[in-house]
Amino acid sequence: QGWTITAEICCAVDTLLASANPDVALRDRTGAPYVDESGGWVDLWNRDVRTYIEELCTDLMAMGVDEIILSRVEHPFAEVMYTREIASSLNREAFCMNFSIAVREEIDKTMKDKNVHLSARVPHDVLTTGTDNGQSMDNFLKVYDRLVIETETYSDDAPLFTEKKIDSTLRFVPQMTWTFGGGSWILD
C-alpha cells in the first residue's frame, strides 16, 4: 500500500524498432536512418510508431500498472527528414504535441477505466532555459498528468510550478539520487 507501479516507454529513440522496420526511422540529410549518440530515432509523426506505443501502453494497463511514463517524446536537435509528408509550417513542438495528443486520445478511455496516469519524462531544461527538442512544460502539462524531471534542486524547482498556479505536489515528480519527505518522487 502506498506504492505506485510505473512503467516507462522510450518513444523517439528506439534503435531496435528503427533497425527492424526502417520505414519508421527518421532520416538524415543523405537519406540514411538517423542515428546519434542516443541511438536510432523513429518518426513520431508515423502512424505505425504511434500505434506501436499505444499498443504497448494498452498491454501495460492490462498488466496492472498505475502509471505509464513516456520518455524521449522529443525531436532530435539535427535537421531530419520524416517518413511522411508534413506541412512545412509545423515545428518541433508540433512534432511532440501531435504524437502526445494522438497517443493520449487513443488510450484515454482505458486509462480512465483503469485509473492509470500518463506522464512524460523531460529534461531539467524544460523548467529553466527551455529546450530545442520540441518539449514544452506548458504544452506537455495540457496532455500529460505529470512531468517526471531529473533534479537535484527540488526546493528550487517546485516554485516554478506554483508561479504558474500548478500544484507541484501533483504534477511534478522529481527524479533524484536521494529521498526527501512528502510528495511523489522516483529514486534512481
Show the residue positions of the predicted features.
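Acidic (Asp/Glu)-rich catalytic clusters
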Residues: 1-2, 136-144, 161-169
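Aromatic-lined carbohydrate-recognition surfaces of secreted/lumenal glycan-active proteins
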Residues: 4-14, 69-72, 93-134, 148-152, ...
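Active-site-adjacent "subsite" loops/lids of carbohydrate-active enzymes
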Residues: 12-58
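Active-site-proximal loop/short-helix segments
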Residues: 15, 20-23, 66-97
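Short, electropositive alpha-helical surface patch
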Residues: 19, 25-28, 123-144
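An active-site-proximal structural segment forming one wall of the substrate-binding cleft
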Residues: 41-73, 136-139
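Alpha-helix N-cap and loop-to-helix initiation/capping positions
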Residues: 44-48, 52, 87-99, 132-135
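Short, well-ordered alpha-helix to beta-strand connector turns
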Residues: 65, 144-145
